[in-house]
Curated annotation (Swiss-Prot):
InterPro entries: ClpP/crotonase-like_dom_sf, Enoyl-CoA_hyd/isom_CS, Enoyl-CoA_hydra/iso
Catalysed reaction, written as an equation: (2S)-ethylmalonyl-CoA + H(+) = butanoyl-CoA + CO2; (S)-methylmalonyl-CoA + H(+) = propanoyl-CoA + CO2; (2R)-ethylmalonyl-CoA + H(+) = butanoyl-CoA + CO2
Family assignment from sequence similarity: Belongs to the enoyl-CoA hydratase/isomerase family.
Localization per Swiss-Prot or TrEMBL: Cytoplasm, Cytosol
Gene Ontology molecular function: any one: methyl/ethyl malonyl-CoA decarboxylase activity
Role noted for this protein: Decarboxylates ethylmalonyl-CoA, a potentially toxic metabolite, to form butyryl-CoA, suggesting it might be involved in metabolite proofreading. Acts preferentially on (S)-ethylmalonyl-CoA but also has some activity on the (R)-isomer. Also has methylmalonyl-CoA decarboxylase activity at lower level.
Broad class of where this protein is predominantly found: cytoplasm
Listed EC numbers: 4.1.1.94
The keyword Cytoplasm belongs to this UniProt entry's keyword annotation: yes
One cellular component term from this protein's GO annotations in UniProt: cytosol
Pfam families referenced in this protein's UniProt entry, alphabetically: ECH_1
Protein's UniProt name: Ethylmalonyl-CoA decarboxylase
Alphabetical keyword list: Cytoplasm, Lyase
Amino acid sequence: MSMWGAVRCRLIQTRSAVRKILQQNRAFCSGSSVGIREKLLAFPGGSVELQKLQESGIAVLTVSNPPARMNAFSGCMMLELEQRVNELEIWTEGKAVIVQGAAGNFCSGSDLNAVRAIANPHDGMKMCEFMQNTLARLLRLPLISVALVEGRALGGGAELTTACDFRLMTSDAVIQFVHKHMGLVPGWGGAARLVGIIGSRNALKLLSGARKVDPDYGKQMGLVDEVLQCSSGEGKALAHAEHWIAPFIKGPAPVIQAIKKVVVSGRELSLDEALKCERSVFGTVWGGPANLEALASKPKHK
């Protein structure tokens, strides 16, 4: 077995341990979710497409629903998003995923047809639980994730941006947590993640004020990492995003994935549990091909 083959085997073994530590309950995919799955399947339309660029190690996940719906999630799209996350979790050659919307808009949340059909507390909570689980797994992927925001990211679309490690906006894009106007609060985990990103005071401002966040304000409060020098719908944003993320994914995929795993554990676990996870992940790269190559070619740091 080659050195890369050996380290991949160790990474696969560690992935199981990391998932156990992070308590990612994949059993949710059956049992309690059966009823809501059947109801979501009744609302087709749109798609969640996944393209894996093997050469760069970047995947592009595109949320697509006709322009009139501004890429709102139909029921079937929610199920499809979960399937795409499943695929990304086992992509051993991957380094990053860019989440974008089609046709110059990011996402406007849930399709109103599906929302009206499950407008009762029981179904609403089941849908909430399903999407919380999916977006939590998206954020925990062993890939560096970037939300590429063109046009508008509204409601659940704004929540989707918080399920990525970084957020990039085109110069004319807007993020808005409009839940208050619908008589709601975020239900896909967006509030909890938003507090972690910008703090409770700023999160309270955005949620209670339903304020439109333009790129400058977003960067000022720490929600946005970079403002791209292009406009929505020009067809240039994805190339800009790939260029922006390139320095962060330079190197072998096993090392990039290992870095993401220890950051996730440090963010979500107690110190003792995070240290245990760090030791486990460290063991997958210590003495691995990248480590040995670096020791041979770089005897001293400069």
